[in-house]
């Protein structure tokens, strides 16, 4: 599996919160899905509230 860096933002109390997270995944699509899953469970966000800007 490769390591991907996912960058994006989500709404927080003080405005948009930027994030950069490294994820191990077989491809970019799976890395993106894992970020949606992790941030959804940790921050109680829906997928539509998370904006992913780049997967590298």
Curated annotation (Swiss-Prot):
<comment type="similarity">
    <text>Belongs to the eukaryotic ribosomal protein eL20 family.</text>
</comment>
<keyword id="KW-0689">Ribosomal protein</keyword>
<comment type="subunit">
    <text>Part of the 50S ribosomal subunit. Binds 23S rRNA.</text>
</comment>
<dbReference type="GO" id="GO:0005840">
    <property type="term" value="C:ribosome"/>
</dbReference>
<dbReference type="GO" id="GO:1990904">
    <property type="term" value="C:ribonucleoprotein complex"/>
</dbReference>
<dbReference type="GO" id="GO:0006412">
    <property type="term" value="P:translation"/>
</dbReference>
<keyword id="KW-0699">rRNA-binding</keyword>
<feature type="region of interest" description="Disordered">
    <location>
        <begin position="1"/>
        <end position="24"/>
    </location>
</feature>
<dbReference type="GO" id="GO:0070180">
    <property type="term" value="F:large ribosomal subunit rRNA binding"/>
</dbReference>
<keyword id="KW-0694">RNA-binding</keyword>
<dbReference type="InterPro" id="IPR023573">
    <property type="entry name" value="Ribosomal_eL20_dom"/>
</dbReference>
<keyword id="KW-0687">Ribonucleoprotein</keyword>
<dbReference type="GO" id="GO:0003735">
    <property type="term" value="F:structural constituent of ribosome"/>
</dbReference>
<protein>
    <recommendedName>
        <fullName>Large ribosomal subunit protein eL20</fullName>
    </recommendedName>
</protein>
<dbReference type="InterPro" id="IPR028877">
    <property type="entry name" value="Ribosomal_eL20"/>
</dbReference>
<dbReference type="Pfam" id="PF01775">
    <property type="entry name" value="Ribosomal_L18A"/>
</dbReference>
């Amino acid at each position: 599996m490769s390591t991907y860096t996912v960058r994006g933002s989500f709404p927080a109390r003080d405005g948009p919160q930027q994030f950069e997270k490294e994820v191990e995944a077989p491809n970019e699509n799976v890395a993106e899905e894992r970020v949606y899953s992790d941030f959804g469970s940790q921050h109680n966000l829906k997928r539509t509230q998370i904006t992913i800007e780049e997967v590298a």
